[in-house]
From Swiss-Prot:
Keywords: ANK repeat, Cytoplasm, Phosphoprotein, Repeat, Ubl conjugation pathway
A GO CC annotation given for this chain: cytoplasm
Recorded coiled-coil stretches: none
InterPro entries referenced in this protein's UniProt entry, alphabetically: Ankyrin_rpt, Ankyrin_rpt-contain_sf, ASB8_SOCS, SOCS_box, SOCS_box-like_dom_sf
Top-rank taxon: Eukaryota
Xref: CDD domains: SOCS_ASB8
Post-translational modification (record): Phosphorylated by TBK1.
Organismal lineage: Eukaryota, Metazoa, Chordata, Craniata, Vertebrata
Biological or metabolic pathway of the protein: Protein modification; protein ubiquitination
Organism: Bos taurus (Bovine)
Positions carrying Phosphoserine: 17
Family designation: Belongs to the ankyrin SOCS box (ASB) family.
Gene Ontology biological process terms from the UniProt entry: intracellular signal transduction; protein ubiquitination
Subcellular location: Cytoplasm
Protein name as annotated: Ankyrin repeat and SOCS box protein 8
Amino acid sequence: MSSSMWYIMQSIQSKYSLSERLIRTIAAIRSFPHDNVEDLIRGGADVNCTHGTLKPLHCACMVSDADCVELLLEKGAEVNALDGYNRTALHYAAEKDEACVEVLLEYGANPNALDGNRDTPLHWAAFKNNAECVRALLESGASVNALDYNNDTPLSWAAMKGNLESVSILLDYGAEVRVINLKGQTPISRLVALLVRGLGTEKEDSCFELLHRAVGHFELRKNGTMPREVAKDQQLCEKLTVLCSAPGTLKTLSRYAVRRSLGLQYLPDAVKGLPLPASLKEYLLLIE
């Protein structure tokens, strides 16, 4: 190799610090094709260094690399560190990958960490309908009724997307279905906002039925009138008008009250121990 070529390569090599190269290697941006994470760390790369808005651990979660996540944690990465967006690695993992979530939780990640908008990892797992991440977070102590800056809960986030699987799990863990955010919206009204766009699927219809069973009774009208967006869809408007006009029955209201009285726990286990007929247990668990 000529001296000029060697000089050029040395200049390129020195352009990036070891820590910058670590980020690029994790993200598979191969500026140096022969770099690997373990060698870079062994060579002195800082596993907690921030480049731009990124930290190595957060980056590994973005690309769903659970092995890399564990390696970084073994080498001293701070599990609850915040990146440039005030998010923890668990916020990113919750959106994408259960394996990364499990590793982070094993190393002490805070399941109730707040980002800059007061969103928890559970909010993001529910929004992305990553049902296994939702379950893993709840099993590790995530607050099922955590409030973001708008007083929306993970259930509200799941409902606004019609995420049936996540809604079902959250309800199993006692999520409050009548919570009202700062704009006066409830989980079921967030779902209705999706349905009125004409984008409803069979799964979203099932999500609506599940939320309706859980809430017992709901009201969308103001001064007896449906919102203008709902009124544009005659068929949906008629259906919702009937549901809103019908008073909650003693049976449905009792179901809501009993479920709420059981508190924040895994309701299928709690209901199983109640001295009730099997049919009533199924009713309490919203199985119809």
